[in-house]
Amino acid sequence: MSEPSYDHQVDRSHMQVSDEIAIQISQMNKWYGQFHVLRDINLTVHRGERIVIAGPSGSGKSTMIRCINRLEEHQSGKIIVDGIELTSDLKNIDKVRSEVGMVFQHFNLFPHLTILENLTLAPIWVRKVPKREAEETAMYYLEKVKIPEQAQKYPGQLSGGQQQRVAIARSLCMKPKIMLFDEPTSALDPEMIKEVLDTMIQLAEEGMTMLCVAHEMGFAQAVANRVIFMADGQIVEQNNPHDFFRNPQSERTKQFLSQILGH
């Protein structure tokens, strides 16, 4: 297998992985009724890691990352995020969610609020940040995702790529320690995908701990320090990008890569 490529020069100077554990998943299982959607998931994520999760549709990859901030409830096993175990305790769930940002396939912006209001809503109401400070932070992150001029517009006035960059900026306004991305480009037109991936690369370059469900293998090659392949609710294989693409071990992984890389 040859390696995919991505048209972006990535600065890895700040991409340091520490020994500190950000996420620990042990023997996690989840069912939807009789359907066993996640099977004995074990995963350790260190602070500063950039992990891309790949796999066919229905493999459980989106469900797994949604369990990390309790958008989905696991039935057995342990999930510990930033030292906090995720149980049914609402206080623990709120603590974890305050440390974990999440960006979805669909942008989930409030259509009746301006872009600036979308970004300041959670900091003001959840973190009790003063309005002026929240607005300054929001403008800082809109600058970072390169759309400060859109602050007073409404979501419907922006392109899909711009809306997704707003969604990323909105998550960053809560100062998360970990960012989760659930197929953030799959609802975008092809010409808008790169602008969102470039924003995510910038986050990675700054040392953000990231888990990303994605189909862009060139992005995985450029940014990830680990690629995880899932199928049938299990982690089938995981490795650094070079070895994952050059020398996949599992037949299931080889089959998947041959389909998406076209050889």
Swiss-Prot record:
It holds the Pfam family ABC_tran. It is found in: Cell membrane. One of its GO terms (molecular function) is ATP binding. Gene3D superfamilies: P-loop containing nucleotide triphosphate hydrolases. Keywords: Amino-acid transport, ATP-binding, Cell membrane, Membrane, Nucleotide-binding, Transport. InterPro entries: AAA+_ATPase (IPR003593), ABC_ATPase_HisP-typ (IPR030679), ABC_transporter-like_ATP-bd (IPR003439), ABC_transporter-like_CS (IPR017871), MetN_ABC_transporter-like (IPR050086), P-loop_NTPase (IPR027417). Belongs to the ABC transporter superfamily. Residues 23-257 form the ABC transporter domain. It is a peripheral membrane protein. This is Glutamate/glutamine/aspartate/asparagine transport ATP-binding protein BztD. BztB and BztC form a heterodimer which can form a membrane complex with a homodimer of BztD. Part of a binding-protein-dependent transport system for glutamate, glutamine, aspartate, asparagine. Probably responsible for energy coupling to the transport system. ATP binds at G55, P56, S57, G58, S59, G60, K61, S62.
